[in-house]
Amino acid sequence: MFLAQEIIRKKRNGEVLSTQEIQFFVQGITNNTVSEGQIAALGMAVYFKDMNMDERIALTTAMRDSGTVLNWKNLGLDGPIIDKHSTGGVGDVISLMLGPMAAACGGYVPMISGRGLGHTGGTLDKFDAIPGYQTEPDSDLFRKVVKEAGVAIIGQTGDLVPADKRFYSIRDNTATVESISLITASILSKKLAAGLDALAMDVKVGSGAFMPTYEASEELARSITAVANGAGTKTTALLTDMNQVLASCAGNAVEVKEAVDFLTGAYRNPRLYEVTMGLCAEMLQLGGLAASEADAREKLNRVLDNGKAADIFGRMIAGLGGPADFIENYAKYLPQSQIIRPVYADRSGFAASMDTRELGLAVVTLGGGRRKPGDALDYSVGLTQVCALGDEITSDKPIAMVHAQSESAFEEAAAAVKKAIHIGDEAPEKTPEIYRYIRQSDL
């Protein structure tokens, strides 16, 4: 028998907690035998004294096991259970293409996603723009769609990782969100509860990233790779660029449109293509569906070009209650804003730098993101045709199109866009879309 206050004292003094102590404390978080004050105190102790890798693995697995852990064995699936997770960005619509692409190559992707908060968009919010799509189906429907379509993208259900829900809300209110140990456990407990064989982790770097510096992003990527592999799930982390909007747009309905255009081949943003292919190729290799990076890319390009990935996206949408002809007729179903108008820079030159976070916040002010959890969204608003770094900007080339519901909302967003995109005399040096891969062998 352990005492919560003794566990807190031990960590406060910088000692290492045993797996049993961590399991006891997490059990207390779940069944309310540990108080809010005690949870806050342990969070602060970990924030200052940190945890070693064994402690992080113990915390992650205890939180994973605090609720239902999905088991796919009895479905008789003929491929690996694979997924990806992103730390969040602006115009990060990767999941919508990656899930169907991986499924088209023989994987099964039970993707449990989140809603947007702050400047980052949420995958579920994008699907809420599709009429009829159920982001919170019962587990039978979720399993059915995963088996039949190969992919289902839904929200976190109440019986998955209850310990994280309680712990996270307390961390949020007590300034301990930024601990790498606690971020690692929070992200991975939710992902690993989906019963994954392999995971590709997308850790963003730059002005629109969750972590403030490249070094902090790399530290998080290393922690996630070590802990996930330690918990028995093959995992690689990719450090990817978020110094500019990833897709050509940011919002909800506008990003769904870009995803469909990507899958059908109507338009593929080159940056979005590179990061999507990098993550998806890693998933295929980790899941044993491809022998090499080149083999994986060949398979992925094939399912894009022959329409199989687009077909699977359509089947997933129909399976979860959306329109059966969504791929063919998405324009009929997606909401459109009252005003769609260009924004021009005050001078000519080159797009030299971008405050991606501010562009994400411009979408929030339009009504396309949340200021606080529970806010209702306008799925039609956002930005499209956002320029890329290095683009030549002239008086007749817009830096973005703003989709707004009123004149005042348009003016406010247009001013924010002009402020966020800096025009210089010279094009900046090109940065890679993927900075590096962190595999288990690199640790």
Curated annotation (Swiss-Prot):
Family classification: Belongs to the thymidine/pyrimidine-nucleoside phosphorylase family.
Stated role: The enzymes which catalyze the reversible phosphorolysis of pyrimidine nucleosides are involved in the degradation of these compounds and in their utilization as carbon and energy sources, or in the rescue of pyrimidine bases for nucleotide synthesis.
Pfam families in the cross-refs: Glycos_trans_3N, Glycos_transf_3, PYNP_C
Class in the EC hierarchy, top level: transferase
Description of how the protein assembles with itself and partners: Homodimer.
Keyword field contains Transcription: no
GO molecular function: 1,4-alpha-oligoglucan phosphorylase activity; thymidine phosphorylase activity
Protein name as it appears in the record: Thymidine phosphorylase
Catalytic activity, as annotated: thymidine + phosphate = 2-deoxy-alpha-D-ribose 1-phosphate + thymine
EC number(s) given by UniProt: 2.4.2.4
Gene that specifies this protein: deoA
Keyword Protein transport belongs to the record: no
HAMAP family (alphabetical): Thymid_phosp
InterPro entries attached to this UniProt entry: Glycosyl_Trfase_fam3, Glycosyl_Trfase_fam3_N_dom, Glycosyl_Trfase_fam3_N_dom_sf, Nuc_phospho_transferase, PYNP-like_C_sf, PYNP_C, Pyrmidine_PPas_bac/euk, Pyrmidine_PPase_CS
Keyword terms, alphabetized: Glycosyltransferase, Transferase
Cellular-component GO terms for this entry: cytosol
Pathway in which this enzyme or protein is active: Pyrimidine metabolism; dTMP biosynthesis via salvage pathway; dTMP from thymine: step 1/2
One of the GO biological process terms: thymidine metabolic process
Organism: Shewanella loihica (strain ATCC BAA-1088 / PV-4)
